[in-house]
Every structure is written in structure tokens, then in C-alpha cells.
């Protein structure tokens, strides 16, 4: 089974198709399952994505009230005998994924997909920790997603990257300072 994991799309207005990289849209449509680890921002973005792929999702800290009411904070799904946990905030940073590892243990999962950091990471120990980064607003990384393949209990995963801005946090800071006359 081919799974695409994304997070932190932060689509505030307009079509999700307009904001996501074209290569990612193709991957989403071809996937058996898409997992979104929160921060769609609007219900419209969630609804549109649900219309183009089979979607499992949780809400993130920036999602609107409608999404927070309809999507759980965390969930566990099972795919071909593999338990996958989905949560938005699991690690304080990509440099230290200890919190994510403990969350995976607490959720009793084989794979933990999480977001919030806007930077991709795949880390394998006794569980697979997978943060897809952000395809639209990465932080000091390239726009990204994760491709997972699960076949008869064997799991493989990789980060895929797309063309686009790589330093949105810096762009935001510059924009803030320009708006405030600094």
C-alpha cells in the first residue's frame, strides 16, 4: 500500500490545488491513502483534499474551530497489520525526537506520523518516526512530503521534496519587520 504523508499545508484561502506543488497533487491522487498530520487551517482545505484522495487526518494547532471540532487531536489506524499513529505536535524539534518516540510508545504504534515542525525527518528505531515537513511553508528545509510503502509487514519510507521556497520562516520575519517599519 502506498501512503503519502503531509502536514502543515496552511491553506488560508483559495484552492488547495493552487497552493500545493503539482508533483504532490499527482502523488496524492495516485496514493492508496493520504495522511495529513494537521494544520490545514480551514475546513475548505480539508474538504477539498478529501475530495481528491482517501484521507485520514488530525487537527493541528492552527486549524479553525470547525476542524478542531470534527477532527481528533490524535488517532491510530491500522494498515495491513501495521499500526500508524497520527498527531500534530509530537516533537519539540527535529534535532530531538525523544518526545515523538515516547508518544509512539504511548500510542502503541509501529509508525508515528507527526507535523508542526515544518521540517522533514524519518527516523527508525523500534518505531518509525515520520514528519513530512510542509509542502507550502517549510522552515529552513525544502517543501516536502513522505512516501511510505507497506507490503506484507515490510515498511519503507522516504522524504520527497518539491520546488518552492525553502525559508518561509525568514520570509515571515522579513514581512513582519517591513510591515512594522523595521
Task: Please place each PLM-identified region on the residue numbering.
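N-terminal active-site segment of His-dependent metallophosphoesterases
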Residues: 1-52, 63-72, 142-144, 177-182
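Helix-adjacent hinge/juxtasegments
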Residues: 56-98
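Short, conserved loop/helix-junction motifs that constitute active-site signature segments
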Residues: 49-52, 79, 105-107
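Active-site neighborhood of phospho(di)ester-bond hydrolases with catalytic His/Asp-centered motifs
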Residues: 5-7, 33-39, 55-61, 86-88, ...
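Pre-active-site segment of Zn-dependent metallo-hydrolases
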Residues: 13-26, 86-87, 91-105
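Conserved beta-sheet core of the metallophosphoesterase superfamily
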Residues: 56, 92-158
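Short beta-strand micro-motifs in enzyme catalytic cores
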Residues: 2, 73-75, 83-85, 128, ...
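Short, solvent-exposed aromatic-acidic interface loops
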Residues: 158-169
Amino acid at each position: 500500500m502506498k501512503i503519502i504523508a503531509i502536514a502543515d499545508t496552511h491553506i488560508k484561502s483559495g484552492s488547495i490545488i493552487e497552493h500545493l506543488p503539482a508533483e504532490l497533487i499527482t502523488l496524492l491522487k495516485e496514493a492508496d491513502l493520504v495522511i495529513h498530520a494537521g494544520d490545514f487551517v480551514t475546513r475548505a482545505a480539508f474538504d477539498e483534499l478529501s475530495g481528491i484522495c482517501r484521507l485520514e487526518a488530525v487537527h493541528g494547532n492552527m486549524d479553525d474551530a470547525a476542524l478542531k471540532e470534527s477532527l481528533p487531536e490524535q488517532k491510530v489506524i491500522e494498515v495491513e497489520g501495521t499500526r500508524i499513529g497520527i498527531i500534530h505536535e509530537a516533537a519539540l524539534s527535529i534535532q530531538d525526537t525523544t518526545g515523538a518516540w515516547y508518544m509512539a510508545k504511548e500510542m502503541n504504534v509501529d509508525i508515528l506520523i507527526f507535523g508542526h515542525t515544518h521540517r522533514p525527518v524519518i527516523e527508525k528505531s523500534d518505531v518509525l518516526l515520520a514528519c513530512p515537513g510542509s509542502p507550502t511553508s517549510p522552515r529552513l528545509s525544502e517543501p516536502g512530503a513522505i512516501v511510505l510503502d507497506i507490503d506484507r509487514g515490510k515498511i519503507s519510507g522516504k522524504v520527497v521534496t518539491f520546488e518552492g521556497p525553502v525559508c518561509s520562516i525568514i520570509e515571515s520575519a522579513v514581512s513582519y519587520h517591513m510591515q512594522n517599519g523595521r
